Amino acid sequence: MKSPGAAPAPGLVAAFRALHHDRAPEDPLVLPGPWDAGSARVFVEAGFPALATPSAGVAASLGYEDGATPPDEMFAAVARIVRAVSTGDRPVPVSADIEGGYGLAPAELVERLLDTGAVGCNLEDSADGALKDPHRHAEWLAEVRAAAGDRLFVNARVDTFIRGVTDPAEAIVRARLYVAAGADCVYPIGAPPEAIPALRAGIDGPVNVGAAPGGAAELAELGRLGATRVTFGPGLQRQAMAAVREGAARLRS
């Protein structure tokens, strides 16, 4: 079953790709993570030029644990988010976290994504708690790129840090393979701030850094360290739920 939606306009994908280049060091691309249509509109109203869905945040909004969302529900949720920010004459590009691709063949995965209207995707390189073979994963990413052409921005997640491999050199090896395979950006999730300069120096392409939601000064510092773009995973969704819990508690007090 395909999610309702329409493929993004080529110009929207190109605009999203351009946001990752020629940025001042202290001005990384900040991509809030909407978990539903309402939160997406809030972020757009705040002036953000693009969004990136977090799979864990979307899962929580649908009542699932992270990693347990059925693919049809994830694609449908992404389509709703895209639709919510595509009204009017200035649609906002949305990139979708689709975890490990849900076992779909590259061509089918690309078409499912395009059906949602997303301009890009996150694809991770671990499964069932273990890192994938980087060469095989790079081959798979190359198939995704071949199927997508320039219609999708591919953000290749590198999971070494969250799988206990703390040496940035290991992340760089994987990142280089993925960039050579056609990834537009790499995301060494869980990289500590002190590792960012080495990652920046060793990777030929945009680098996504994950962060806790913070202020402009913290984001600028990540940019100076080498982050091209900053995302927050489910952090904003969890902040929102904390506020809901606080409000619920007040109703009972």
Can you name each region flagged by the protein language model?
Residues 245-253:
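C-terminal segments
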Residues 2-234, 238-246:
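Alpha/beta enzyme core
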